[in-house]
């Protein structure tokens, strides 16, 4: 498991108040982790801060699973 995934799982678990074991790569933020639209906005903002990246609005709406977020973060880090 990559360090990025571990950090992301910790962030998601804390932000959404869910058991870390439920934060799998295929977990959907809304359907499986119980996030509403405000939770997702706050989660995106926390990810931006913690990973020092910007997530453009048109991409933010496409990030629905932990894997989506991980892919986006890793791509942004590679671009730096």
Curated annotation (Swiss-Prot):
Coiled-coil features, chain-numbered ranges: none
Signal sequence annotation: none
InterPro entries membership: ACP, ACP-like_sf, PP-bd_ACP, Ppantetheine_attach_site
Pathway membership, UniProt: Lipid metabolism; fatty acid biosynthesis
Residues modified as O-(pantetheine 4'-phosphoryl)serine: 37
UniProt KW keywords: Chloroplast, Fatty acid biosynthesis, Fatty acid metabolism, Lipid biosynthesis, Lipid metabolism, Phosphopantetheine, Phosphoprotein, Plastid
Start and end residues of each Carrier domain: 2-77
Family per similarity comment: Belongs to the acyl carrier protein (ACP) family.
NCBIfam families: acyl_carrier (TIGR00517), PRK00982.1-2 (NF002148), PRK00982.1-4 (NF002150), PRK00982.1-5 (NF002151)
UniProt protein name: Acyl carrier protein
Organism: Cylindrotheca sp. (strain N1)
Gene (name only): acpP
